[in-house]
Amino acid sequence: MKICLIDETGAGDGALSVLAARWGLEHDEDNLMALVLTPEHLELRKRDEPKLGGIFVDFVGGAMAHRRKFGGGRGEAVAKAVGIKGDYLPDVVDATAGLGRDAFVLASVGCRVRMLERNPVVAALLDDGLARGYADAEIGGWLQERLQLIHASSLTALSDITPRPQVVCLDPMFPHKQKSALVKKEMRVFQSLVGPDLDADGLLEPARLLATKRVVVKRPDYAPPLANVATPNAVVTKGHRFDIYAGTPV
């Protein structure tokens, strides 16, 4: 995949070249999207909109730390949707990991989560965030046990995953309504890189075959159900809903 690669570390140790080789990235000076290695982290920038800033994965500080410490925990919509109750903490595959937020929430309340991400740039950002998270004194121990990354396309990888999880989560990129200059800066940068998941409808069936208990699909409130398969079961929040489908028992 082509992207502009920028090293701002000043270390001169070739770390960016190693990273590019690992994720199959090719430097393209004219690309509007840039993957930047800073002294602190790896980040994604949209070069024609510098005001948007850089997007990076941070499990240790910022919004994620706040959500972990002060968020709803088991009361969060995604936790309710996967069916966490009492001692039941399902094994989860997050088949469209994105920046790992929902996966991290589930891991922080005790679920073991395997994240799948097919876009190599997003996978590189996740991997960088995980490495820093694993090294953190406060959360590193449980994070290593509960949150892992698999760089693979969900469409091909879902049939190969063992052991089967109890729950599969899907959150395909859906085109945002035009009116939203409100669309978060992050979404704008992200959509420029990834675009809408045009093949997302093909994920529902393999996800249902893989999950032993249920599939949870996160949708904007205005979006139709995935693959136009309606379900009466959903956890509804402001702006989103988590549609719930039966999996395939062992």
Swiss-Prot record:
Q: Name one Pfam family in it.
A: SAM_MT
- Which EC number(s) are documented for this chain? 2.1.1.242
The organism's superkingdom is given as Bacteria
Q: Which reaction does it catalyse?
A: guanosine(1516) in 16S rRNA + S-adenosyl-L-methionine = N(2)-methylguanosine(1516) in 16S rRNA + S-adenosyl-L-homocysteine + H(+)
The alphabetized UniProt keywords are: Cytoplasm, Methyltransferase, rRNA processing, S-adenosyl-L-methionine, Transferase
GO CC term (a single one): cytoplasm
Primary localization class, coarse: cytoplasm
Q: Name one GO molecular function term.
A: rRNA (guanine-N2-)-methyltransferase activity
PANTHER family found in the cross-reference section: RIBOSOMAL RNA SMALL SUBUNIT METHYLTRANSFERASE J (PTHR36112:SF1)
NCBIfam families, per this entry?
PRK10742.1
Task: Family membership, please give it.
Answer: Belongs to the methyltransferase superfamily. RsmJ family.
The name this protein goes by in its record: Ribosomal RNA small subunit methyltransferase J
Q: Which organism is it from?
A: Escherichia coli (strain UTI89 / UPEC)
What gene codes for this chain?
A: rsmJ
